[in-house]
Amino acid sequence: MKYILTLLILCIACTSHDKAAQRAPESAKTRVGSSAESSVQAEKRSDKAVSLSPDEQQTWRKRLPLPAKCPNYDPDPSDPDSFGARVLMLNEKQTVVDARCMLGSYQPSHLVFLWDGTAAKPLTFPVYQTKPPAKTPSRSDVGELWGLTEFDAAAKQLKVFSKFRQDGDCGWSAVYSFPDGVVKVDEFHLKSDCDGNDAMNPQHWPAVQVQ
């Protein structure tokens, strides 16, 4: 009888050990998965442009040689597209600053500067448009950007979507980068015909061969 009881106790102990061994890899896998997920989330957070408080935005604006037509702008905290200034850090010494200027009827204007730690330099941007009777787009360099802007911190780029009318079925969109602090056009799309098609989808518009 004692022999049978001893065998039963040994069997129960072996069964408990096996179940614990089976759970251990699952727990380790869960920990590894959680760690990997945290790394991905951290990477995504690091890709986002620097978020500035309203006070920080005003501090940046005071560093810029803004003209009188660009009044002091108080952003609406509830509107992510409302801002006084945004920054894109290119490196330890250079920062691109996007300052909201005039509001406009359906899209605002922006002045963009390169800050080197001591002074701000106004930047100009190549824009391509078709001017009748010409049928091919021609380039002009503008210092004031009308439209919606967005920084891509991971790619160190500025994205612009400029509408010719409120419907957004015509206009242009561009992606700019800043190698060595110089403005470069990486991508440009233009749609001159306001025909109601492809509204708010500038990525579907004809691409322009940039110079």
Locate each region found by the language model.
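Short aromatic loop motif centered on NTY/YTY
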Residues: 124-211
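Structural motif
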Residues: 105-113, 168-175
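Positively charged n-region of N-terminal signal peptides that target proteins for export
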Residues: 1-4
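C-terminal motif of bacterial Sec signal peptides marking the signal peptidase cleavage site
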Residues: 11-13
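Surface-exposed loop/turn elements that mediate protein-protein interactions on large endomembrane-trafficking
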Residues: 70-71, 114-128, 177
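Sequence contexts marking disulfide-bonded cysteines in secreted/extracellular proteins
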Residues: 15, 69-71, 100-102, 169-171, ...
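Terminal domain-start segments
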Residues: 15-94, 205-211
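Acidic/hydrophobic-patterned starts of short beta strands in beta-sheet-rich repeat architectures
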Residues: 90-100, 152-161
